Amino acid sequence: MQTLLALNWKMNKTPTEARSWAEELTTKYAPAEGVDLAVLAPALDLSALAANLPAGIAFGGQDVSAHESGAYTGEISAAMLKDAGASCVVVGHSERREYHDESDAXVAAKARQAQANGLLPIVCVGENLDVRERGEHVPQTLAQLRGSLEGVGADVVVAYEPVWAIGTGKTATADDAEELAAAIRGALREQYGARAEGIRVLYGGSVKPENIAEICGKPNVNGALVGGASLKVPDVLGMLDALR
């Protein structure tokens, strides 16, 4: 199974900055065997990425509408992302769940829309600090996973985000990542049977060049969803080098 390095820019980079980033990457990029690279960018950046990314690097969106089309002002449909050249899209990111009150049902609807339009959904799940401290992190995350995959096909990626370790002073370890990735793998087997073996489980919590090899070296971790370290080309190259 190919490792997936998914670069989540969040709300960063104008189209001009995205073009400069892609041009810089082009001058220095060498594919890493066994590693797929995808850039998850603001919607306005997609055309710049389509025109300037090196061949073989995928790109996609950070959110998608749960609706096919219609009177949903401000929304971006899966068909629009696909037409812009995207091949994947994040749904259910912890920031969307927290700041936009997205439910598991809405996340599942978005994932279904993505799949219906030929996009690979990257479904995010994870627990907060209160849940972690109560020792309920595994059942809570798996309940979120099942709700977020309701009616969703096996052509999906799952990203575990340790929300409790983001901006709290707490540190998630590679073993923490493996614990949840293994539990997620078990839940995927229950839902999808043998097809679960082809589903990549990513880890998304302060991943950087210094720790990505240890994290992705765990048996059930098949890649990383990277935030801050995705914004600078040298950091991206450092992560690719660490995975070689």
From Swiss-Prot:
Localisation per UniProt entry: Cytoplasm
A GO molecular-function annotation: triose-phosphate isomerase activity
Known pathway: Carbohydrate biosynthesis; gluconeogenesis; Carbohydrate degradation; glycolysis; D-glyceraldehyde 3-phosphate from glycerone phosphate: step 1/1
GO biological process: gluconeogenesis; glyceraldehyde-3-phosphate biosynthetic process; glycerol catabolic process; glycolytic process
Principal subcellular localisation of the protein: cytoplasm
PANTHER family: TRIOSEPHOSPHATE ISOMERASE
Classification via NCBIfam families: tim
Name of the protein described by the UniProt record: Triosephosphate isomerase
Source organism (scientific name): Deinococcus radiodurans (strain ATCC 13939 / DSM 20539 / JCM 16871 / CCUG 27074 / LMG 4051 / NBRC 15346 / NCIMB 9279 / VKM B-1422 / R1)
